[in-house]
């Protein structure tokens, strides 16, 4: 999380810094973004930046935490809401995903995240997010335990792979929200009912 010096700044200055960082990560992936561009936009020194954030990644994660939603947490909430009915949760999940991904003010952030995410970033993000998450942790832990038990655990890894690839393709191929939902519903129907009909 940001350093204490950041939180000691006046609210107006904090917001200016966050907006500059957000703009940088809307316009560039994490591999192309730079502290240099951020401090030049703000008219501050590199030294000042490092009194607020440990590194560029921490500033990136701060924006992700503030501006985006963790999709697996959306799914876990739906799974819990539907009393463990996996198929119902998956049906609603597609609608929630499409609604969130295609918000105009968030689209660029999600695009740069899903096209340029790496295992190293994922590990750092998990550490950062667990320290700062704002969801009801007890509720989420109960839901997470349900889906991580036994055979469900491997199945959830499979669903995660399917969904992440759909999201990545949606950005690579510039899908609309409608096209994304069409692909999502088709692939989830394969999960539910198998491939027999399309192979015959």
Where are these regions (language model features)?
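Basic, helix-initiating cap at the start of DNA-binding domains
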Residues: 1-28, 37
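Short amphipathic alpha-helical segment with a characteristic S/N-K-E followed by hydrophobic residues
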Residues: 55-60
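Generic hydrophobic, amphipathic alpha-helix propensity
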Residues: 13-21, 38, 63-71, 75
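Hydrophobic alpha-helical connector segments
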Residues: 62, 76-103
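Short hydrophobic/aromatic patch on the recognition helix
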Residues: 43-53
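C-terminal peripheral helix-coil segments that are non-catalytic and often amphipathic
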Residues: 165-200
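N-terminal secretory/targeting leader peptides
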Residues: 2, 26-31, 36-40, 62-65, ...
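Amphipathic alpha-helical packing segments from all-alpha helical-bundle domains
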Residues: 69, 117-165, 182
């Amino acid at each position: 999380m940001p350093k204490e010096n950041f939180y000691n700044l006046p609210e107006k200055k904090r917001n200016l810094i966050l907006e500059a960082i957000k703009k940088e990560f809307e316009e560039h992936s994490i591999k192309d973004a730079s502290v240099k561009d951020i401090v030049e936009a703000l008219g501050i020194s590199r030294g000042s930046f490092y009194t607020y954030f440990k590194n560029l990644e921490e500033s990136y994660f701060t924006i992700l935490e503030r501006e985006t939603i963790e999709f697996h947490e959306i799914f876990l909430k739906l799974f819990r809401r539907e009393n463990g009915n996996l198929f119902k949760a998956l049906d609603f999940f597609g609608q929630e995903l499409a609604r969130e991904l295609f918000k105009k003010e968030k689209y660029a952030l999600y695009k740069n995240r899903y096209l340029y995410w790496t295992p190293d970033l994922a590990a750092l993000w998990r550490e950062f997010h667990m320290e700062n998450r704002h969801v009801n942790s007890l509720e989420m832990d109960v839901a997470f335990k349900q889906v991580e038990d036994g055979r469900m655990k491997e199945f959830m890894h499979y669903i995660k792979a399917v969904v992440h690839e759909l999201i990545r393709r949606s950005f690579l191929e510039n899908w609309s929200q409608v096209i994304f939902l069409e692909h999502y519903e088709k692939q989830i129907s394969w999960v539910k009912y198998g491939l027999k009909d399309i192979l015959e």
